[in-house]
């Protein structure tokens, strides 16, 4: 089910590393897979790629962000059983809990897809005194730039989804 090794991805390109993390099946104790452990140089490369992508992402239309998130929903749904099995192996979760976490992943991306086209500003009434008659304030929500996340290990799909999906939705 799992590949022998997994790279890390930077700017949509697979990256290998000199150091790998062994991942053991929590039930059998056997080696399940190995994943690349990025070094400081790879982290700097990822940060540079994120900074470079900031403007194009800011200009990415809400409907396009929605389409990306909906594509994720579709792909996660197709691979639901595979994702649940990987959670069982990697995190030691019972299959029922793992399946529930995959469902939550899908729901989080679905909700983010729905909200991607609803992230708007506000019109504020500033007519708080006679001298302010006809005054209004306007807000507009705009992406600020790259974000970084640190998530705990106990819900690896769910807790990452709660950071990544809204970030994509917001641009």
Please identify what each model-predicted range represents.
Residues 1-28, 125:
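Hydrophobic face of amphipathic alpha-helices that form TPR/SEL1-like repeat modules
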Residues 8, 88, 117, 130, ...:
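Short glycine- and Lys/Arg-enriched binding-loop motifs that mark or flank ligand-binding interfaces
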Residues 12, 29, 65, 109, ...:
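Residue-level signature of catalytic and energy-coupling elements of molecular machines
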Residues 24-25, 40-43, 157:
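A short local loop/turn or secondary-structure capping micro-motif enriched for an aromatic residue
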Residues 26, 38, 150-152:
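Generic beta-structure capping elements
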Residues 32-120:
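Glycine-rich loop-to-alpha-helix module at the N-terminal edge of alpha/beta enzyme cores
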Residues 126-170:
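Conserved small-residue-rich beta-alpha loop and adjacent elements
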């Amino acid at each position: 089910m799992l590949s022998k090794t997994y790279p890390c991805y930077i700017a949509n390109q697979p990256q290998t590393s000199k150091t790998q993390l062994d991942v053991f099946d929590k039930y059998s104790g056997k080696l399940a897979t190995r994943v690349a452990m990025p070094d400081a140089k790879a982290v700097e490369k990822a940060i540079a790629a994120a900074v470079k992508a900031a403007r194009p992402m800011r200009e990415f239309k809400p409907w396009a962000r929605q389409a990306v998130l909906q594509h994720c929903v579709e792909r996660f749904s197709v691979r639901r059983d595979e994702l649940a099995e990987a959670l069982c192996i990697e995190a030691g979760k019972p299959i029922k809990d793992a399946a529930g976490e995959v469902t939550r992943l899908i729901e989080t991306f679905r909700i983010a897809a729905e909200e991607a086209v609803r992230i708007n500003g506000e019109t504020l009434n500033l007519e708080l005194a006679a001298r302010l008659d006809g005054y209004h304030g306007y807000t507009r929500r705009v992406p600020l730039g790259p974000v970084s996340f640190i998530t705990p290990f106990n819900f690896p799909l769910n807790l990452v989804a709660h950071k990544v999906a809204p970030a994509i939705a917001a641009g």
